[in-house]
Amino acid sequence: AASDVYKRQVFIAEAQTLMFACRETEPGKVNIIGLKDKVLLSGRSHVETEFVIRHLSPFFPFFIPASNLIQTSLENIGSIFHPSVVLFNAATIERNIPFYFYRDMTPKIASFIEKLDKERIEVGEAFGQKLMPVSDWIVYAYPSTVGNTLCERMKNNPAYYDILAPGSIFTRQLTEDIPTGLIPMSDLGKAVGVKTPLMDSIITITSSLLNIDFRQKGRTLLNLHLDRLNKEQIIDYLS
């Protein structure tokens, strides 16, 4: 009966990132450049996580169970990679000078990304999560990646090799990764007394650059109605 459909339990889960490295070639067509080997996934509970993975694994075998939604949220590596590269190349992007987003990586920007990543890892530690550094994650997700440093690995990942930089600074790599990635990471840090000065700097500068108040529009604990919870309550709510 139709009424039975509405009584069925719906399981909602999130992955740490998109399973594909891909780009739209034209409306309705996507070029899949690479496929990640492992992607963390979590539901609202361990039971829901196991249920979702069990039903998705015949079609998407690369999903790995995460401990909770805090882990999948903080393992959003794109939020560490994307804003840094776009921000430090904003003038080049505005001048419409094409360059490769990863292949043209430089040691200094890669070093900044690693410093930014340390803030993410410290926030994770405060919530009981041992997060994977970005340099290790590239090899974890893309085993064919070669290189010893983060810079070398970003330049020598076959899935990244031909990905061009965006054509505008109004790109999802800022307009999505700031409000849905760096904002909640920064806010979780504030909730447990972990300072995130580099994250906060990127958020502030990008908000001014694009004239978008990301703090007002982003996924803050206030906007998610989690601002009155302590650390243990946040962990319990997201586990």
Residue ranges and their predicted role:
Residues 8-18:
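Short, acidic/small-residue loops that bind anionic groups at enzyme active sites
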Residues 20, 107, 176:
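Glycine-rich phosphate/pyrophosphate-binding beta-alpha loops
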Residues 25-34, 79-84:
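Short, surface-exposed amphipathic charged segments that create phosphate/polyanion-binding patches used
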Residues 30-33, 99-100, 161-166:
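A short alpha-helix capping/helix-coil boundary motif
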